Regions:
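N-terminal presequence-like segments and the immediate start of the first folded domain
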Residues: 1-104, 108-122, 126-175
C-alpha cells in the first residue's frame, strides 16, 4: 500500500507501536507536507519545489523509506533504530548503547549530505520505558552540542520524548 502512494520517491518515516489510537484505528499516518511555497536556499523558486532524497551505506537503510528527504530549507531524517550499519543488526547492550547508535546513525546521514550535526533543530525520542530517560539524557549530552560555537552558546535542539508500547526489532529507543 505504501509504495502505491509514493511512486517517485520514498519519504522519511518513523514506525512505532502504541497502546491505542483514537477511534480504535489500526493505523495512523503523520505527514509533513509542502505545497511548493518556499525556495531552495540562495536559488529562485522555479516551478515545482525540488525534493532531494539521499541514502548512505553508513547508516541503516530500509526499502520502504528514504534516510533523508530535503525540501526548501528543511531536511527530514527517518527515525533511526539502534542498528549497526556494518552488520545490519541491533547493537548489543542496553538503552545507552542503543541511544548512542541511533545518534551515530543520524550523524552518518547528516555527514553524507554535508550538514553539521548542530543544524538539528528538533529531535523526537521514542522510548519503550520512561525509566530510561536519564540514561538517554547522559548519551544525548555527549552528542549535543557538537561544535565549539554550539557549545559556547549551550545550544540544544528542541526535543520531545514519546513513550511507546513497542519499537521495531524490540528496540528500547528510536531517535
Amino acid at each position: 500500500v505504501y509504495r502505491a502512494f509514493f511512486t517517485t520517491y520514498l519519504p522519511a518515516r518513523t514506525v512505532m507501536a502504541v497502546a491505542a489510537l483514537p477511534m480504535d484505528a489500526l493505523v495512523q499516518v503523520e505527514a509533513l507536507i509542502t505545497n511548493g511555497e518556499g525556495t531552495i536556499p540562495n536559488e529562485p523558486q522555479a516551478g515545482d519545489l525540488v525534493k532531494y532524497v539521499n541514502n548512505t551505506h553508513n547508516a541503516p537503510y530500509h526499502a520502504l523509506s528514504t534516510q533523508t528527504v530535503a525540501f526548501s530549507h528543511y531536511n527530514n531524517i527517518t527515525g533511526q533504530l539502534p542498528i549497526d550499519p556494518a552488520t545490519g543488526k541491533m547493537v548489543e547492550g542496553g538503552v545507552a548503547e542503543q541511544a548512542a547508535q541511533c545518534l551515530k546513525n543520524i550523524k552518518a546521514v547528516l555527514t553524507s549530505i554535508d550538514v553539521p550535526f548542530d543544524d538539528i533543530v528538533k529531535v523526537n525520542v521514542f522510548l519503550t520505558d520512561l525509566a530510561d530517560v536519564d540514561a538517554v539524557n547522559e548519551v544525548y549530552t555527549r552528542f549535543f552540542p557538537d561544535s565549539g560555537i554550539a557549545r559556547a552558546v549551550a545550544y540544544m535542539p528542541a526535543r520531545t520524548i514519546v513513550p511507546v508500547a513497542a519499537l521495531p526489532m524490540h528496540a528500547k529507543v528510536q531517535i
